[in-house]
């Protein structure tokens, strides 16, 4: 019987650092080894999953990227407890159209470098259900208090967000932050080819650990989403209501509205080949002459926004992207993304001149499931490179950002990152190790070398002679080890232990080191980002 899959919930701070974009290691492998290969758009809708996965119980404890399925099965208390290993939610009485899940994350830790006590206390509730088999709903409410490691504290102070959750941070005292979280959505699915969603949530577009198109590192945002799957094609259109927090006061009264329209076409060209095309545009809610609001010109479901921009005399922030995914020998996947913020062939040919608006990025990655012929062992490696000034705009309000974080890679631009991971999962037990190495060109007060995408590119240092890592070259190294166990009890419980060592150095100008351990228990329904 198909189980009730939950909507993905947003990140705890340090507890579930090993969670994959895909639902679990087992599910990741099974997902790729079936005919279902539209894996880039997340979260998934559970009714889109192959039946062998939906019925197998693989999503137990790893539902980070599965949305509630409108067509919920009828499940009694007796059947629920008999099938406990297949699900992570409670059902009220005999009803098949209502579920209730507690949200909790209790963690404690210690930073060995700064001798600081770390903690994370989050509590909340998730309510979901369906109406007449075609309409599903979901609501998540939570609040928390956290004390962060020094580099995460720096992010919270600078970007006004709590790393992992992405929600706005409110300073309670010198080292603790409070935050509230509200998200949810309504899904209408009239048939197997079409689904429409409205709500407030996070999204991730890609097959890697990071995404150069759309990532989940920032705040949840209001959205409307249309997805259609026909033949070998899947088309996704996302309309988003974002915010700009760059006003110096930091007051909510100064937050400015901005909007985005994003499209993605996924084409299964062959059993082993998937090709994707991405396009997005961000525009400000007000300009110097008028209040624009949501521009209906961008409701056109067809992609290619540049002609629309030209017809309106607009200078909105539009970009184009491409992705390629190649699968071979069942358990091996190569994936890639290319993002083009600007593309002028004349300047591309004259690459060595270093024109400032050569704003592009590339991702190359490789995953191997059952690595070294060990079942449920995943190996992943990934490289991300983004040139200076990519994602930025002449108007900071139109930068490719939301709230205090980028919409794509958390480092913004002007960087190169190498990522590696080895993870093992078996019968509720998981252990993983990650290594992250980054080099970026740091901006300082009064300079703009292209790393801070919240700053207008009109303040750039030079038109020509720009290169990767320009500015104050900074090296970042992060190592992480995580072990966790999820109990198959009537009350879902996951115990985890995480150790992270991170160093960041800008020559002789700046050095920031952190080594900490975190331990605690949580309901494992989210993924988080603290590895940058």
Predicted regions located by residue number:
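Outer-membrane beta-barrel channel domains
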Residues: 21-274, 279-285, 351-360, 367-393, ...
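Bacterial Sec-dependent N-terminal signal peptides
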Residues: 1-24
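Generic hydrophobic-segment detector
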Residues: 6-9, 196, 326
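Exposed, low-structure sequence patches enriched in small/polar residues
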Residues: 179, 273-532
